Amino acid sequence: MVGGGPAGAYLGFLLAKEGLKPIIFDHSHPREKPCGGGISILAIEKFKLLHESPEEKDLDYNIEFISPSGTSVITTGKKSGWILSRLILDKFLLDKAIEQGCTLIQEQVIDVQFKENLWNIRTKMQTYQAKFLVGADGVNSIVRKKILGPIPKQDLGICYGCFATSNKKEVTRIKYFEDIKGYAWCFPRHDHLSIGIGMAEGDTKKIKKIFNDFITSYYPDINIKSKWGAKIPIIKNPHFYDLPCADDNWMLIGDAAGHVDPITGEGISYALWSAELAAKAILKKDPKSFNEMWKKEYGDTLRTSCTSRDFFYNPKLLEYSIKLASKSKTFSTFLYEYTMNQIPSKDLIKRIIKDISKITKEYIFSSLRS
């Protein structure tokens, strides 16, 4: 496997647990990453291994949403998400994989070639050979570039942010904007803040300006420790999901496969989920079955998010949704649960229809009181 982040490490753990001897190539993990660090309720409930992490998990039952015009509402969920630094999460998963019997080669892979039924994996130090290759090497995947070509530029989003400290106790905050399809965030971690902005398209100059304005407006007194920038898969063409992610001798998982929610940008759940399905396909000696497995399990959710992204980020809809959440406890909880990946995109309309009567009554009652 090329890549020792959540997808690669979890796959290594699962395969080693079943007696295989997987090898992970990664020269940099575990490390802090440009990532908010939010662990969704979906991930917490689905992947029990996460509960074994000895590190303190910052529980988060509340999220403040801010509309493009500045209207805000604090939503509360019935279940809590977690906030962890990626250094802690990635180290935990990689350590578990190694403990289970996975081998870590701390060398940077610079090229892969398939010759005479073997993969030649070239690092900066030497060349290795393998019969089967997994690309878990993120958005800029070398494995993907060699097999399918890179993720198209139009399907890449950009993120920019910082790690900072504050004397104030901050809440989890998400801020939407008038003219970008994305949002700014603040995730309070155990001993620092992760603050950033992600958008589906745009240039570095624009995202830095919006980020700096966000800091000036909401966090003027923080102490910035470091800044970062990164790309993220934000798929805009639903036909992207028609591409194969596996064949007889290779597989792509996590960000390398483009498996990130196109609306929320959440990728950890799908990194772990894709690893779980990949392990099943490999263990039954049918790696190509991974193509149908991931589409059946979460493909509809990613595709629905992709096709409804423009609708979701309509400024008028965002304004109305946050106003509605301020007047309806049911809709407020719905907004929280969707953000925490409790409600998949494909079930959004069904869930709203189910609760529409209750939401309407709460809205009318609240409006009359005010």
Predicted regions and their residues:
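A conserved beta-strand/loop capping segment in the N-terminal third of enzymes
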Residues: 39-92
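Glycine-rich FAD pyrophosphate-binding loop
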Residues: 2-4, 11-35
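Generic enzyme active-site microenvironment
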Residues: 24, 135, 253
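C-terminal helical "tail/cap" subdomain of flavin- and related membrane-associated enzymes
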Residues: 280-370
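Predominantly flavin-linked oxidoreductase catalytic cores and closely associated redox partners
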Residues: 4, 14, 18, 96-226, ...
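A short, flexible beta-alpha/helix-coil linker loop
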Residues: 30, 71-72, 193, 257-260
